[in-house]
Each structure stands twice: as structure tokens, then as C-alpha cells.
Amino acid sequence: MSTGQAHLNPYIEGDSVLHGLDSIIKTMSLLGLLIFIALIPTGAWAFYLLTGFLLLSGYLLAELHLMEMVKRSLFVELPFFFILVPLLLMRQSDTLVQFELLNRPLNISAAGAERFFNILVRSWFSILASILYASVTHFQEFASAMRALGIPSPIVAIWSFMWRYLVLLVNEAQRMLRARSARSGRVVGQQAKAGGSLAWRASVTGQMVGSMFLRSMERGERVYQAMVARGYDGEIRAHARPILRPFHKIFLSLELLIITLLVITAFQVYGLR
């Protein structure tokens, strides 16, 4: 594994139950859980607790460091938090909190707060589920499972190339940073930092970024031409094409049935809101 791939790869080595589970089963479970999270009605907190329990059980079965995974998920969740903040101020009925910002009165309504926390929890659970899946499933297993589930080959190819080109970009960036460090030494005992002003550093950084993308594009083109020369026609045939076996179809049917029953129950209890 290259250095860039080692930095990017979210997979965590292990011998837990989830690590050894069939990749198609894991992929169907992830997709089913994401669909269920998206369909939970607003305010159905009991079903959010059920989802949280399922995720906690998954992390325990995977034998992962729970707090480390939670920190990683919160880091990914942070942009969603700022995007969702305006929801707190969209509805003016049932005011919970009233305050002023820049001499302008603002109200946080009960309906807006409920919608804010619902979407925030949904996005966080989706991130936790995705991190759990990525931690116990190799990327190649994910691509094979997508092919087995009938996902169109161009989409699988785009995912595969995205991963490989991200690795390529990281490798190029690491090479350029090493070269920069080798050329930016300073005299032992010298207190001043090596290099010029802030504007000079910004100029050098911009040139490095531009050079990195040009070099990455050239290298990517060489890789693609080498693949075409070896018979690549849009589908990677490094492994035998996986197929859906009878137990996969049974599992998928049961999963869809359970999700349907849970969603119907949630809407009957909490209604459409």
C-alpha cells in the first residue's frame, strides 16, 4: 500500500464479526439503514433511539474504538451543523428563545428547533453508519458489492477512479512537501523562520498547488493510457464478477420488509409532519 493510500484508507484491520461478514450483506445493510434513517418522520425520537442502538451494537461487534469514531464523525458533521443553523429561525410560531443580533430581533421557534435537531441527528447517524462500513470493508470489496447489486458499471468506475486519483493527488502532494522541506532548511541556532513574507509564502503555495494538479493530471493520463493499452474498456476485471446468491436475495427481501414495517409503524405513531 502506498503512503497516500495508507493516509486515505479508512479501513481498520481486525478479525471481528463485521470484518469477516460478506461484503454484499454489509453493503445491503448500509443502504437499508441509510434509507431507514432518511424515512424516519420528524419527531420520531423512539426510532432515533432504535437507530442509535443499532449503530452502537455495530461498533461493538466491529471492536472499534468508539470515542475515536465519534470524534471523526463529529468532525465530518460540523459543516452540516452550520448549514442547518438557519432552520432555527425560519418559523416564527411557538417562540422558544428571543434575542437580538446586530440590533435585529431573532426568534428560535419550537418547530424550527425540532426540525433542526431531527435533520442534524439524521445526518450524524448517516455519517456514523458510513464510517462503520468503511472501517470494516475494503474499498475493492465495496466496488465488487456495488457491481453485484446491479449498480451501473460507469458509476462503479467513477467511484473506483475517484479513490485511485485521490491517492495519486496525496502522493504528489507528499512528494512536493518533502521537496519543499528539503529546500527550506535554516541555520542551526537561527531564530528567524526560513522563507520570505506572508505574500511570498502565499505565492509559493499557489504555485505548488497549480504544479501539483498539472503533475497529477499528467500522471493520471499516463495511468489511463496504460490501462487502455492493456484492454481496459470501462470495467476493471481484476476479480471475478460477484453474483447475488439465494441467501443474498433472502436477506434483501427480509431487510426491505423490516424497513417497510418500521417506517409504516413510525408514521402511524407519529404521523406525517
Where in the sequence are the language-model features?
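Structural signal for the C-terminal ends of transmembrane alpha-helices
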Residues: 39-40, 58-64, 136-137
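Juxtamembrane/interface alpha-helical elements of multi-pass membrane proteins
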Residues: 72-198
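Alpha-helical transmembrane segments and their helix-start/interface "positive-inside/aromatic belt" motifs
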Residues: 67-78, 251-254
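Membrane-helix interface segments
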Residues: 44, 65-66, 151-155
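Short, aromatic-rich membrane-interface segments at the entry and exit
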Residues: 43-50, 68-71
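Hydrophobic transmembrane alpha-helix segments characteristic of membrane transport
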Residues: 50-57, 140-145
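Transmembrane alpha-helix interface motif
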Residues: 1-43, 53-57, 171-273
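Alpha-helical transmembrane segments and their membrane-interface exit regions
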Residues: 54-62, 77-82
